[in-house]
Amino acid sequence: MHILITSGGTSEAIDSVRSITNHSTGSLGKILAETALAKGYQVTLITTPTALKPDPHPHLRLLLVKNVEELLTQMKTEVPQHQVLIHAMAVSDYTPVYMTGLEEVEKAQDLHTFIHRENQEAKISSKEEYQVLFLKKNPKIISLVKEWNPAIQLIGFKLLVDVSSEELIQVARESLV
């Protein structure tokens, strides 16, 4: 059986030195991969450069991604080739579109113009007292998996913070495919 596992957390670049990321360590994905390898399965692990990784193994294929765009490209290729997907990666919900000083935003007639702009500098200047960052929603990759491989067994994870046990159960039931 070929198992695809995702782990770690994506990071979305604001400019060449800044990014939006999360605190995912990849430890769950590492443990899942090690367990599957110990049981004799072929494992493809899609993970991030900073995530914890299992030791090299003859049945382990490691693919590195940094952001949602790279993850989407890898998943489109890999999902059809696997029987099981354990999607344990913390995927960025948003990606930066444009960052500018508050004064420029205040002068704008129409805020929609900012969502069609891109920063031209490799590093955005830090001289402004306040910056405004425009973000765009990323695609929900887990919702595309069954389009790429309707037969795949899909296991997903969702982090919720400060919610009751009842809400956890409700969200889990709503997530069942």
Question: Language-model segments: which ranges?
Answer:
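A cross-family phosphate/adenosyl-ligand binding-site feature
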Residues: 1-177
